Swiss-Prot record:
Family, per entry: Belongs to the IspH family.
Function per UniProt: Catalyzes the conversion of 1-hydroxy-2-methyl-2-(E)-butenyl 4-diphosphate (HMBPP) into a mixture of isopentenyl diphosphate (IPP) and dimethylallyl diphosphate (DMAPP). Acts in the terminal step of the DOXP/MEP pathway for isoprenoid precursor biosynthesis.
Chain sites annotated for binding [4Fe-4S] cluster: C12, C96, C197
GO MF entries: 4 iron, 4 sulfur cluster binding; 4-hydroxy-3-methylbut-2-enyl diphosphate reductase activity; metal ion binding
Gene designation per UniProt: ispH
Protein name (database record): 4-hydroxy-3-methylbut-2-enyl diphosphate reductase
GO biological process: dimethylallyl diphosphate biosynthetic process; isopentenyl diphosphate biosynthetic process, methylerythritol 4-phosphate pathway; terpenoid biosynthetic process
Keyword Iron-sulfur: yes
E.C. numbers: 1.17.7.4
Top EC class for this record: oxidoreductase
Pathway membership: Isoprenoid biosynthesis; dimethylallyl diphosphate biosynthesis; dimethylallyl diphosphate from (2E)-4-hydroxy-3-methylbutenyl diphosphate: step 1/1; Isoprenoid biosynthesis; isopentenyl diphosphate biosynthesis via DXP pathway; isopentenyl diphosphate from 1-deoxy-D-xylulose 5-phosphate: step 6/6
């Protein structure tokens, strides 16, 4: 059995930054550190940080006065931000800069009195945070997930309308929704560059290349990870059997027993150690040496806040 690895895969710059913010805060201030929502959607990462003293909460009211609070990589609404400001808290923002970019687009539309449409998945924390940047009562903020949602949507003024997208969507599905928006609202204005982030796009391109060669595709990522789910869906659309797994223990030998080639990739919030564990598991089932496919090189780095720029090894 051949083992192929997608390239790129795993951590993106936004996830790296968010995890570093929590790790550095723990090193500098000591436990406990409070984090609103899972800092990234990966069970292994969250459990590891929890063991080191991070406490994950959903409501600001759960945080005691004088504590350190970190916003997750998915971002928060202005209401949550204002609630935190009203408290005696030290706040660090781990919102991915590419999510912040979308926040700024929504805030700009709100200031201008334009209505705004967000393409995204209802209930996802990134969507909740992005929708929460709009505050103009004279306008309106709407969420659509599919072309069907677009055709049933009514707005107040089609002449002052813009759209944005969640950063972790399917590139193909989002293109279909944008096409529907432009047909339904010919004057709608979109971002100069697609809001779907570079890492999401690159990993979808990589899994497409992987699925062209593999019989079975394993996507390492947690069930609540939007970008990981999109990778599994894309492989399935290409006619491959695909499984979303948290770790190597999830793999059933029956999944790969008849496969000549198994492809492995990882969502943007999944650490490489999980991929290495999957490779080891597949080798137990008769797999050969893992081969990494050629892919797009990623060199993007997002800096942590200056107050947290410290060599953790020196602190420890």
């Amino acid at each position: 059995m051949q083992i192929l690895l997608a390239n790129p895969r795993g951590f993106c710059a936004g996830v790296d930054r968010a995890i570093s913010i929590v790790e550095n805060a723990l090193a500098i201030y000591g436990a406990p550190i409070y984090v609103r929502h899972e800092v990234v959607h990966n069970r292994y990462v969250v459990d590891s940080l929890r063991q080191r003293g991070a406490i994950f909460i959903e409501q600001i009211s759960e945080v005691p006065d004088g504590a350190i609070l970190i916003f997750s990589a998915h971002g928060v609404s202005q209401a949550v931000r204002n609630e935190a400001k009203s408290r005696d808290l030290t706040v660090f923002d781990a919102t991915c800069p590419l999510v912040t970019k979308v926040h700024m687009e929504v805030a700009r539309a709100s200031r201008r009195g334009e209505e705004a449409i967000l393409i995204g998945h209802a209930g996802h924390p990134e969507v909740e945070g992005t929708m929460g940047q709009y505050s103009n009562p004279e306008g309106g903020m709407y969420l659509v997930e599919s072309p069907e949602d677009v055709w049933t949507l009514n707005v107040k003024n089609e002449g002052k309308l813009s759209f944005m997208t969640q950063t972790t969507l399917s590139v193909d599905d989002t293109s279909d929704v944008i096409d529907a928006l432009r047909k339904r609202f010919p004057k709608i204005v979109g971002p100069r560059k697609d809001d779907i982030c570079y890492a999401t796009t690159n990993r979808q391109e990589a899994v497409r290349a992987l699925a062209e060669q593999a019989d079975v595709v394993l996507v390492v990522g947690s069930k609540n990870s939007s970008n990981s789910n999109r990778l599994a869906e894309l492989a399935q659309r290409m006619g491959r059997t695909a499984f979303l797994i948290d770790d190597a223990a999830d793999i059933q030998e029956a999944w790969v027993k008849e496969a000549a080639c198994v492809g492995v990739t990882a969502g943007a919030s999944a650490p490489d150690i999980l991929v290495q564990n999957v490779i080891a598991r597949l080798r137990e089932f008769g797999g050969g040496e893992a081969v990494t496919l050629e892919g797009r090189e990623e060199n993007i780095v997002f800096e942590v806040p200056k107050e947290l720029r410290v060599d953790v090894r020196e602190v420890e």
